[in-house]
């Protein structure tokens, strides 16, 4: 269920307005992911990687409009995809996962816009018929 995205949920907005919470959420995503794939980095490494992740998200126009939920889903699905990229968590791996998620989100948004366009055209057609009938009543 894709809804029109609130800009306040997008990474770029949160980076400008709530960076500490965004970084904490990145730490949570990375901690969960490291656990799921069996890597055991130090807390310092997780925090460093979280800073790199947030920087990647905020400064890559492809990812800056994503939400933290999109990012979390990308990591969750990336781990479970079972391909060679899911063996280790690193910058290259998460960029692969994020690009895949961004494509899925973009496809859903396009489908939603097409659906709304078809609904609009159908409503316009029905309204045109109603107006035509109303004119005939005169």
Where are these predicted regions, by residue range?
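Charged interaction scaffolds used for protein-protein
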Residues: 1-138
């Amino acid at each position: 269920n894709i809804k029109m995205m609130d800009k306040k949920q997008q990474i770029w907005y949160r980076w400008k307005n709530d960076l500490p919470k965004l970084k904490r959420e990145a730490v949570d995503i990375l901690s969960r992911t490291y656990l799921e794939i069996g890597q055991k980095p130090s807390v310092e490494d997780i925090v460093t990687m979280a800073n790199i992740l947030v920087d990647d998200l905020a400064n890559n126009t492809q990812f800056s409009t994503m939400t933290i939920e999109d990012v979390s889903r990308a990591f969750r699905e990336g781990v479970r995809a079972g391909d060679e990229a899911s063996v280790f968590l690193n910058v290259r791996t998460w960029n692969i996962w994020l690009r895949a998620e961004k494509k899925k989100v973009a496809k859903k948004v396009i489908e939603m816009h097409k659906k709304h366009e078809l609904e609009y055209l159908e409503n316009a057609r029905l309204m045109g018929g109603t107006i035509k009938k109303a004119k005939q009543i005169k």
